[in-house]
């Protein structure tokens, strides 16, 4: 489900309201910075000054995921308590792309996170480019499935997608000595901060 946690401020607000809005934004940015720094220490197990760009990406993704999970569970509880029917979408492929910028946009958190990251001395565009495409398929079927899921979320339709967690769902190509060579896509090589392992249900 798509949520707007921090709606854009009305441009017609009076000066006091505008100052409060800026103060709220500053508070959100400070909270995000603190959370990212905590993830660097507690998840990567590193001193902040020794963190590399991949560590910063993982910390940022997990900080955002924390905020998504609360909304996700709230939505699930609401659907269950209301007795809403839900859609279970089965597909062999789900080409969901890169989730960081997509989730930041859907949660209306792009600017606070960008500001927080750059205040910490990290280039946001470089951090964003660290994330690999999720190699969960290689064709139009996967893109269509992802679009269906996005549409249902936008329409607030309770839905769950089920597919296959491919380790090598795509391949990469290089040209070496005039010959094309293909290699499996190692998208999980450094882990996936967006997933929850459910070893108890496998």
Residue ranges and their predicted role:
Residues 2-202:
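A conserved ligand/cofactor-binding region detector
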